[in-house]
């Protein structure tokens, strides 16, 4: 109850100020006193958990005196913040339908009703509300941002692109990153139906929106591979190392396939060496170790792995080093113990999440471009360090 009382303090202050000003007018003193008593009665209903009676009383007061609009807007927002969305909708809907509101007040009511519908998951109704505000100077950016949330929630990617492009024109350049992702989402739909040409057209638009989009480059690489154009796939996938080196590990298996198809094993080793030098993660180190072992022998690979473990210690590289030691160990209890230890390390590596959102900390075993927790784009990266990649 005390929590609710504190939540009501802004409403009481606003209404008290208003009633004090109105009460100064002697000819309306009686009316002010009656409305003040009604307001206190409404608060009492709230404090006694009779919220519906309180809402009815406040709405009746609104019909008699539109000077309480701001107080009612605040009250509706309080209900929404407490999860009582139905009551918030009742209040804001009644406000919006009131014939005595000023133009500005009506826009405020529409805005808050749209947020109520968003909170209730009624996206079609919320969309209708915010569309009414997109041509209003003081409400335009906020309404477009709300619409952008709606279209992402409903996977209406072309609408999301249209809204985001309007925001870019209004100075919100950060939306370019999201626009590239929206084009990628559309491209995925066409890739699923084997319409690779249309998918590539969409990806090029994504690249135009954000030239640093690693996701666009990775998806272009996949499309080129599907079309058998391995040289172009290599060109696209290699761009990632300059766009976002933390995501290079997502390209390595595809690049390995492309270089094999092209018969360019030396160039593949050179790229891995570059990836290792730029500290892109354990995947590149382990792949290069395999090449060194095949070319120069197990001992050379072990020396290389030991050096990398000293520079950038990770459990995955340590697990690889244990494999080399096991291959050299003589049969006996020492080797058996080493095998147990290696298996324990391997299980730990497999059980650890591979990715983490840099914004909210959400962890996952697969890469998400759109964080399921905080809904941010491009914030999930491979985990680095001892337990990471």
Curated annotation (Swiss-Prot):
Cytoplasmic compartment residues: 21-389
Pfam families linked to this entry: TPR_19, TPR_7, Zn_ribbon_LapB
Binding site for Fe cation: 357, 360, 371, 374
Sequence ranges of the TPR repeats: 35-68, 69-102, 107-140, 142-174, 180-213, 214-247, 249-282
InterPro entries in alphabetical order: CellSynth/LPSAsmb/PSIAsmb, LapB, Rubredoxin_2, TPR-like_helical_dom_sf, TPR_rpt
Topological type in the membrane: Single-pass membrane protein
MF GO annotations: iron ion binding
Location(s), subcellular: Cell inner membrane
Entry keywords, A to Z: Cell inner membrane, Cell membrane, Iron, Membrane, Metal-binding, Repeat, TPR repeat, Transmembrane, Transmembrane helix
Transmembrane portions of the chain: 1-20
SUPFAM superfamilies: TPR-like
Biological processes annotated in GO: lipopolysaccharide metabolic process; regulation of lipid biosynthetic process
GO cellular component term, pick one: cytoplasmic side of plasma membrane
Family according to the record: Belongs to the LapB family.
Function in brief: Modulates cellular lipopolysaccharide (LPS) levels by regulating LpxC, which is involved in lipid A biosynthesis. May act by modulating the proteolytic activity of FtsH towards LpxC. May also coordinate assembly of proteins involved in LPS synthesis at the plasma membrane.
Designated name of the protein: Lipopolysaccharide assembly protein B
Upper classification of the organism: Bacteria, Pseudomonadati, Pseudomonadota, Gammaproteobacteria, Enterobacterales
């Amino acid at each position: 109850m005390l929590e609710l009382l504190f939540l009501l303090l802004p409403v009481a202050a606003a209404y008290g100020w208003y009633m004090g000003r109105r009460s100064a007018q002697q000819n309306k003193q009686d009316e002010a006193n009656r409305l003040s008593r009604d307001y206190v009665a409404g608060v009492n209903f709230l404090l006694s958990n009779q919220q519906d009676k309180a809402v009815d009383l406040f709405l009746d007061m609104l019909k008699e005196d539109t000077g309480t609009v701001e107080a009612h807007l605040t009250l509706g927002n309080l209900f929404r913040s407490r999860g009582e969305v139905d009551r918030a909708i009742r209040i804001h809907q009644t406000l919006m339908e009131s014939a005595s509101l000023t133009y500005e007040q009506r826009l405020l009511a529409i805005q808050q009703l749209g947020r109520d519908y968003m909170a209730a998951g009624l996206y079609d109704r919320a969309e209708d509300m915010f569309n009414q505000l997109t041509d209003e100077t003081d409400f335009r950016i906020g309404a477009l941002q709300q619409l952008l949330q709606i279209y992402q929630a409903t996977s209406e990617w072309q609408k999301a692109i249209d809204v985001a492009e309007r925001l870019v024109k209004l100075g919100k350049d950060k939306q370019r990153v999201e626009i590239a992702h929206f084009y990628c989402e559309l491209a995925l739909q066409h890739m699923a139906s084997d319409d690779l040409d249309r998918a590539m057209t969409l990806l090029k638009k994504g690249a135009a929106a954000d030239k640093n989009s690693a996701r666009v480059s990775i998806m272009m690489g996949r499309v080129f591979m599907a079309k058998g154009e391995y040289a172009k796939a290599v060109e696209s996938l290699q761009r990632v190392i300059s766009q976002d080196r933390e995501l290079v590990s997502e390209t390595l298996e595809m690049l390995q396939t492309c270089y094999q198809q092209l018969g360019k094993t030396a160039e593949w080793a050179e790229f891995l060496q570059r990836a290792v030098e730029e500290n892109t993660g354990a995947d590149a180190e382990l792949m290069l170790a395999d090449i060194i072992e095949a070319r120069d022998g197990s001992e050379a690979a072990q020396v290389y792995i030991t050096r990398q473990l000293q520079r950038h210690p990770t459990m995955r590289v340590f697990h690889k080093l244990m494999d080399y030691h096991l291959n050299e160990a003589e049969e006996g209890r020492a080797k058996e113990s080493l095998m147990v230890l290696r298996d324990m390390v391997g299980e730990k590596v497999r059980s650890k999440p591979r990715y983490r959102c840099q914004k909210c900390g959400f962890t996952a075993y697969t890469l998400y471009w759109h964080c399921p927790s905080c809904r941010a784009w491009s914030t999930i990266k491979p985990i680095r360090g001892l337990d990471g990649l």
